[in-house]
């Protein structure tokens, strides 16, 4: 395949006598001089004496005109050198590709670089964004889902000719990994069933069908939507997620796609929305269950703490002591231990310190078993230290 290298200059050649014919074609010169008369001149005009007469590349006939055109070492009639598309004569420059001639306007329209997003041609002076073999306008280099314009440094994925930002690609990956949509999404309305062929009904018989898993079965062609087509579909989906036949036909006419492609896109979009709603509901249920478990645990902990709380002051009993219930003088002065045979066993007397405690009274807490610190100190001051009592007994014994 020949590739055009740019506009070719057209040269005009003037044919002379038989000795100069090949020379003039090789050097690509243009000359104009008076015609000679006579037999030789007539032979030159008829081309009978020119053994290397030029043949037109377009019509494949010998060139007997006074002037001829040369393009890529090929000769052309002036009337044959014209654009293949618009049929306009080429006088100053042309583009040559696949053995065909084009003018500048038609060549740029057919073979110039086109944006992979909007499919419009890209001017030579425009800035572009490249992704592998695809070229985009700066405004068309955006995510096909969220339509966010991708800039230098952003992470994206080029999947089947469509640009996806990182977040939307991960969402789509999670949707695909979670499983296929429910069978309820494949149910079609009455007007949709007319567009489906009866022979394709076995595809939706169940998940156990081997039709989709047969490696020998050829894959169906995947339709890649442009940005304008996707915007038109989304705008119609916001109005109605299940449009009627008339709306689908209108969308198909506007986008240049078939009615079947429009119908399949709406089915896939409904399944996607339903799957997202189901996932959101599962997340809400999981959060509610976690919150309920935390509330149950906190209520149990509060119950355990309240079961070990101290008793109210009205329920606590403090043991009090009466000063008149015991004698401050455990023995009589002037009596010695031998004169009081039983006093050496009970030097402080037989009276008990604690009185008036009913047998029915029970200790309800550990605080009932202890006296206040101030009361214990006052009692020790009144009773005295036992060591001091022993010394006083000894001094009274020897004094007697």
From Swiss-Prot:
Localisation: Nucleus
Give start and end residues of each DNA-binding region: 218-277
Summary of the function given for this chain in its UniProt record: Required for early specification of the kidney glomus, lying upstream of wt1 in the pathway controlling glomus differentiation. The balance in levels and expression patterns of binding partners such as lhx1/lim-1 influences differentiation into glomus or tubule derivatives. Involved in specification of serotonergic neurons.
State the organism named in the record: Xenopus laevis (African clawed frog)
Q: Cite the record's tissue specificity text.
A: Shows a temporal expression pattern in three main areas: neural, kidney and limbs. From stage 13 onwards, expressed in regions of the nervous system including the placodes and otic vesicles, eye, specific sets of neurons, and in discreet regions of the neural tube. From stage 13, also expressed in the presumptive pronephros, and from stage 27 expression is predominant in the capsule of the pronephric glomus. Also expressed in the developing forelimbs and hindlimbs. In metamorphosing tadpoles, expressed in the eye, brain, muscle and mesonephric kidney.
Principal location: nucleus
What is this protein's name? LIM homeobox transcription factor 1-beta.1
The record, for SUPFAM superfamilies, names: Glucocorticoid receptor-like (DNA-binding domain) (SSF57716), Homeodomain-like (SSF46689)
């Amino acid at each position: 395949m020949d590739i055009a290298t740019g506009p070719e200059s057209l040269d005009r050649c003037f044919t002379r006598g038989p000795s100069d014919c090949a020379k003039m074609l090789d050097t690509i010169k243009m000359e104009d001089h008076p015609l000679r008369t006579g037999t030789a001149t007539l032979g030159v005009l008829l081309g009978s004496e020119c053994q290397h007469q030029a043949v037109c590349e377009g019509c494949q006939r010998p060139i007997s005109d006074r002037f001829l055109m040369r393009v890529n070492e090929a000769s052309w009639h002036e009337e044959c050198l014209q654009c293949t598309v618009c049929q306009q004569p080429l006088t100053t420059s042309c583009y040559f590709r696949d053995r065909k001639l084009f003018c500048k306007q038609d060549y740029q329209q057919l073979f110039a670089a086109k944006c992979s997003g909007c499919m419009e041609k890209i001017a030579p002076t425009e800035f572009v964004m490249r992704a592998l073999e695809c070229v985009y306008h700066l405004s068309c280099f955006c995510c096909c889902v969220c339509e966010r314009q991708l800039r230098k440094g952003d992470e994206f994925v080029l999947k089947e000719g469509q640009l996806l930002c990182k977040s939307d690609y991960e969402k789509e990956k999670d949707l695909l990994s979670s499983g296929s949509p429910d069978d309820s999404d494949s149910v079609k309305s009455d007007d949709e069933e007319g567009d489906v062929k009866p022979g394709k009904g076995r595809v939706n018989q169940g998940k156990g069908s081997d039709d989709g898993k047969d490696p020998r079965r050829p894959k169906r062609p995947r339709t890649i939507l442009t940005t304008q087509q996707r915007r038109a579909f989304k705008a119609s989906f916001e109005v109605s997620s299940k449009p009627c036949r008339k709306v689908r036909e209108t969308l198909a006419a506007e986008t240049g796609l078939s009615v079947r492609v429009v119908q399949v896109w709406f089915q896939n979009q409904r399944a996607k929305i339903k799957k997202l709603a189901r996932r959101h509901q599962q997340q809400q249920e999981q959060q509610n269950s976690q919150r309920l478990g935390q509330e149950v645990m906190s209520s149990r902990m509060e119950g355990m703490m309240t079961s070990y709380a101290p008793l109210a002051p009205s329920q606590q009993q403090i043991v009090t002591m009466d000063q008149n219930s015991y004698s401050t003088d455990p023995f009589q002065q002037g009596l010695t231990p031998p004169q009081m045979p039983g006093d050496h066993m009970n030097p402080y007397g037989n009276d008990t310190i604690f009185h008036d405690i009913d047998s029915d009274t029970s200790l309800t807490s550990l605080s009932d078993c202890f006296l206040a610190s101030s009361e214990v100190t006052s009692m020790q001051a009144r009773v005295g230290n036992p060591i001091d009592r022993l010394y006083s007994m000894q001094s009274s014994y020897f004094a007697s």
